[in-house]
Amino acid sequence: MYQFNFILSPLDQFEIRDLFSLNANVLGNIHLSITNIGLYLSIGLLLTLGYHLLAANNKIIPNNWSISQEAIYATVHSIVINQLNPTKGQLYFPFIYALFIFILVNNLIGMVPYSFASTSHFILTFSMSFTIVLGATFLGLQRHGLKFFSLFVPSGCPLGLLPLLVLIEFISYLSRNVSLGLRLAANILSGHMLLSILSGFTYNIMTSGILFFFLGLIPLAFIIAFSGLELAIAFIQAQVFVVLTCSYIKDGLDLH
């Protein structure tokens, strides 16, 4: 007999659940589990590979998959070139492109009804932001040594204000770890919660009677329009994330 678990709270859709678990008595008691976030990240990886396989054709007339992939490639390439430069940017372009595709695909998967929005989880976005900022910091230290800390010293500031301004710059630099991941997760989380609340509200109205069914078409139209906005946000947030990533890498390379 099947058991259906209805979503009673807008936050239930973001709960991480075990889909399959196994206790293995190998090297001690090892608990292996597959969660919904792991499953959807794997689905995102498979979709990304499938998309690039469909786009990889050598025909004179490209198909729609190739055109869309070339558009994404050109967009990310222009971001890298503008934020870094044509020479240094080529070295970091594969990482930035993979990061953009990863975020975009998982944002779009979250738009599918009854799916799981992986990028709405702070544990995932904070892991990415901490890794990126830490990598940019190591890059700056490797390239400039102790001169890297001049990044926290504003040029032309009075000597009396120097300790305070250095402290402010240092706190601002540390906050990148939080702000980069927080921006992505908060936008995806808030949008999905609002859609969930509006959908439940519209469903209750339209199932209350014939008259209310037609009245419910008004919020239903708003939900459709807001879904289009969420689709645009999925692209925008992926772009913002890689733009800021390029900016942090540039700070490590050029100290400004």
From Swiss-Prot:
| UniProt main location, coarse | mitochondrion
Record's keyword terms, sorted: ATP synthesis, CF(0), Hydrogen ion transport, Ion transport, Membrane, Mitochondrion, Mitochondrion inner membrane, Transmembrane, Transmembrane helix, Transport
Q: Does the keyword Transport apply?
A: yes
Q: Which domain of life is it from?
A: Eukaryota
Single GO term (MF)? proton-transporting ATP synthase activity, rotational mechanism
Q: How does it assemble?
A: F-type ATPases have 2 components, CF(1) - the catalytic core - and CF(0) - the membrane proton channel. CF(1) has five subunits: alpha(3), beta(3), gamma(1), delta(1), epsilon(1). CF(0) has three main subunits: a, b and c.
Q: What is this protein called?
A: ATP synthase subunit a
Biological source species:
Emericella nidulans
